[in-house]
């Protein structure tokens, strides 16, 4: 893969200490790939039986419908994918919806939703009851989001194309559950998307942190009292994770961190 940015490596070395070498070694290990069966289209047991005819599947332990598959399976090329039988999604990305754990009948917001992996997973948990609002600020990515929602056969989802501030005007204290999978500097994507290496800089980390805090502020106004807001990123930077959450909590003492 493309050489990792030196400033990024220096930051990671300082942050990880003795675990730094293991972190570097992880870039040479095979990528873990997964898919999530869509029980909105067919009974899970039947879907699993069908998919095992074509793919080598091993269960992802933290989600009901998630499976690892082997690289040479190429499930994205199979007609079952186009039919919406499953969604190709990294196993780690399946964790957020599992932690948010919406219940059938609840109102749920995925604020930064494209391309739709987490949204379609949240919708499956609603079991056709309640409503899911899947929002994406970028028009081109919003079209992809809409296509995936349609492909997965989700009937109780509304796709919106707004910034978080605009959306918050329409849904004050409305949602039981909100997912903010925030735009970030993408440090966790370097191995998957090598172009992200060239786009990274310490300045981008700072900029992303400011934007994430703004998104969280707007999300807070859309959450019902007693609701649950889950914040996630695909980056390692403390400025975009721990520090963002810390600043948010300082401004919102009515919120507290839930242990998972």
PLM segments and residue spans:
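S-adenosylmethionine
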Residues: 1-260
């Amino acid at each position: 893969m493309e050489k990792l940015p030196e400033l990024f490596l220096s930051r990671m070395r300082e942050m990880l200490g003795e675990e730094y070498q293991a972190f570097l070694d992880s870039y040479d290990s095979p990528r873990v790939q997964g898919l999530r069966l869509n029980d909105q289209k067919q009974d899970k047991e039947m879907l699993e039986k069908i998919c095992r005819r074509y793919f080598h599947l091993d269960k992802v332990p933290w989600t009901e419908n998630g499976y690892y598959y082997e690289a040479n399976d190429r499930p994205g090329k199979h007609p079952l994918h186009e039919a919406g039988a499953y969604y190709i999604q990294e196993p780690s990305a399946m964790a957020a919806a599992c932690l948010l754990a919406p219940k059938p009948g609840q109102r749920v917001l995925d604020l930064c939703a494209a391309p739709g992996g987490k949204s379609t997973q949240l919708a499956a948990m609603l079991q056709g009851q309640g409503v899911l609002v899947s929002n994406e600020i970028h028009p081109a990515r919003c079209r992809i989001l809409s296509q995936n929602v349609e492909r997965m056969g989700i009937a109780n989802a509304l796709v919106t194309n707004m910034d978080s501030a605009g959306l918050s005007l329409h849904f004050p204290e409305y949602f039981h559950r909100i997912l903010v999978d925030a735009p970030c500097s993408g440090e966790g994507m370097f191995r998957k998307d090598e172009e992200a290496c060239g786009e990274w800089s310490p300045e981008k980390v700072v900029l992303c942190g400011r934007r994430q805090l703004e998104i969280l502020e707007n999300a807070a106004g859309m959450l019902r009292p007693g609701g649950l807001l889950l914040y996630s990123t695909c980056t390692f930077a403390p400025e975009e994770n721990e520090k963002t959450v810390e600043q948010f909590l300082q401004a919102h003492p009515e919120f507290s961190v839930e242990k998972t």
